């Protein structure tokens, strides 16, 4: 009999899996979700794409090169992922009263009914939980279980894809000891490098240190905590998390930035990191803030507030770039950060995001940006791959391809099965922009959310790009 069981539920390839769920033709295809521009980054990759070596946070051009012409590249649909995530964890909460949600796609739980249970009973419960999520949403989860959060999270990683891994308490130390030290929660690239320089490659080697040695290497605060985790001591409680007020990312440069070209190149990468966290959080942002620390250590911040919350990368990044001052006027820049705030649930992304920005400039509040402008208006006849559309007879669909005066639409949703493709003139009046949520085909569930006016849980979202 074991005393405590913590579960870690992790949705498998969540962003790409939601795309394959709502666009059935993509099932079994190598799907990449992320930025489509030259500096785009992969936010999510299906397991079919991962088989080629593609992964999250990889430059999109590199992932496409690895996969070749069979790659399906789609822009993120944050509003769809948010509702899918909400339904997943509503389902989990039907079996477990307290869920500590870390992001869109993962959470801890400590079911009270498993206190003192044997491993076989835990396996049965985990399978019941996975089956309930799959039946309710059509999405696949992996579940790990152990005596604490650390072991549970490692176990869910070992269970992927589409599996369960229950680690008995007597097995935990043996499992931990042989793993790379980077697998320990809280060990980032900087700490990993410090440990490697001292010949400490595994969690077992870290556990063999004394408390004093761990504190000396990793710091007086974090060192002892990581040392305890390495020894399998993890009594952290599972608790509901409060919503973060801001999502941010920043980087300190070894050499100061002195030109607008350097600033533009740097902010694209930093904003991409912050945007990935925004997508995982599940809410949209209204306010974009750019933070700059000059070579004299003084700090300058500039911000702009849009009329509505959004997860649209194009709108957010364009505003961030336009907030940048010229280093020739203010001096060299040693640190640059991007923050998204004014976070709230989005039930529907604006169908003409850039146009809304242009038309509602008077409603936007700008700080320290006299004369700032917003993105140019969107041309409604220029369809993008991944756009959700509707046809009066064929129903809901998505743009599969566009160019040379025509647009190809695949008409399908989660409940339809693989659909047929139709080609139209690009200026056709037969198709119109549609809500991405219609692709989920959950009218009753989404309608109930609208009635409740409730918000989903979210994860803490502070990110330091400089330590990645």
From Swiss-Prot:
Record-stated family: Belongs to the DNA polymerase type-Y family.
Keyword tags: Cytoplasm, DNA damage, DNA repair, DNA replication, DNA-binding, DNA-directed DNA polymerase, Magnesium, Metal-binding, Mutator protein, Nucleotidyltransferase, Transferase
Organism placement in taxonomy: Bacteria, Bacillati, Actinomycetota, Actinomycetes, Mycobacteriales
Site positions (Substrate discrimination): 15
Main location per the UniProt record: cytoplasm
Residues the record lists as binding Mg(2+): 10, 105
EC assignment: 2.7.7.7
Name of the featured protein: DNA polymerase IV 1
GO annotation, biological process: DNA-templated DNA replication; error-prone translesion synthesis; SOS response
Record function comment: Poorly processive, error-prone DNA polymerase involved in untargeted mutagenesis. Copies undamaged DNA at stalled replication forks, which arise in vivo from mismatched or misaligned primer ends. These misaligned primers can be extended by PolIV. Exhibits no 3'-5' exonuclease (proofreading) activity. May be involved in translesional synthesis, in conjunction with the beta clamp from PolIII.
Domain UmuC: 6-188
